[in-house]
């Protein structure tokens, strides 16, 4: 009996020893198991490589532009008579466009973000429709809406204005192409502000305008700046609607197009660089400000 009991105990201890913490797990049929750290490092390397490829592909046009531009051709193009007039036209029309968006787009974004308008989905659908319309289609629709042979066009003529091949037409085209970007971005920025903060300020006696000025706009400021910067870049590059309703006066996009058609690619590249220099600093500055504001909130 004692020998049988000892044999059973030895067998039991052997079974427990195979599955206990002191024993290694059996090897997988395909070989030794991979360490989770190795798997994570391999997947991380693949992710970084894929991200780098995508990043280089996105920046490829800009890098190619800088590599192919000739200093001599740039000097000749930018110093030719009237070469800087498109830059002035683009900056002036872009500034007016931003002013219109700030004055008209910000209240609309606030009303939509706070649900103060009836049928908010209809308003948002309208903004998305304008956002998704091809720019050339926007230009055609503007001709039928504010052209010289429309009721709006006749009303503008009575005021000695015109929405065809004028500075006003250029601003209208830029507003229509950039407004959805600003209003939708401003909606998201204002919607991220906690309404309870506005309610607390109102309970303390602040009027709605003061609440908007002292609470809502400062908290939504980075997001509003980012939306405005995107609208600026969109207005600076507006071409499809502009070429139909405002072929004159020339802005930078039309200058690039006409130079490309008349004298070739080498002469158009310097104006493309000027357009990038004018259009990109504001979005980059807004991005840096927004990132810093987010870090301050988290910290």
Task: Tell where the protein language model's regions lie, with residue ranges.
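Membrane-water interface segments at the C-terminal ends of transmembrane alpha-helices
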Residues: 38-72, 81-191, 215, 219-235, ...
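Short hydrophobic, aromatic-rich alpha-helical segments embedded in or entering the lipid bilayer
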Residues: 247-261
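Short glycine/proline-centered loop/turn elements that form peptide/ligand docking sites
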Residues: 193-197
């Amino acid at each position: 009996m004692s020998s049988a009991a000892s044999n059973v105990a030895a067998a039991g201890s052997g079974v427990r020893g195979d599955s206990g913490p002191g024993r290694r797990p059996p090897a997988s049929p395909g070989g030794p198991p991979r360490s989770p750290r190795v798997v994570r490092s391999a997947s991380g390397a693949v992710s970084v490589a894929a991200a780098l490829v995508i990043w280089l592909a996105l920046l490829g046009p800009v890098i190619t532009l800088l590599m192919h531009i000739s200093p001599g051709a740039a000097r000749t193009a930018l110093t030719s008579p009237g070469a800087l007039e498109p830059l002035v036209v683009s900056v002036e029309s872009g500034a007016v466009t931003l002013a219109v968006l700030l004055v008209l787009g910000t209240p609309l974004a606030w009303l939509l973000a706070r649900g103060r308008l009836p049928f908010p989905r209809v308003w948002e659908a309208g903004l998305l429709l304008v956002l998704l319309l091809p720019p050339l289609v926007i230009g055609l629709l503007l001709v039928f809406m504010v052209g010289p042979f429309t009721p709006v066009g006749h009303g503008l003529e009575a005021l000695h204005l015109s929405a065809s091949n004028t500075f006003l037409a250029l601003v209208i085209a830029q507003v229509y192409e950039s407004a959805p970007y600003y209003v939708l971005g401003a909606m998201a920025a204002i919607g991220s502000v906690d309404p309870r903060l506005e309610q607390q300020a109102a309970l303390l006696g602040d009027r709605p305008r003061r609440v908007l000025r002292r609470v809502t706009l400062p908290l939504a400021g980075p997001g509003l700046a980012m939306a405005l910067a995107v609208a600026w870049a969109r207005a600076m590059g507006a071409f499809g609607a502009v070429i139909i309703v405002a072929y004159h006066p020339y802005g930078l996009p039309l200058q690039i197009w006409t130079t490309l058609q008349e004298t070739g690619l080498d002469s158009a590249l310097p104006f493309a660089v000027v357009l990038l220099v004018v259009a990109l600093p504001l979005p980059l500055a807004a991005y840096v400000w927004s990132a810093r504001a987010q870090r301050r909130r988290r910290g």
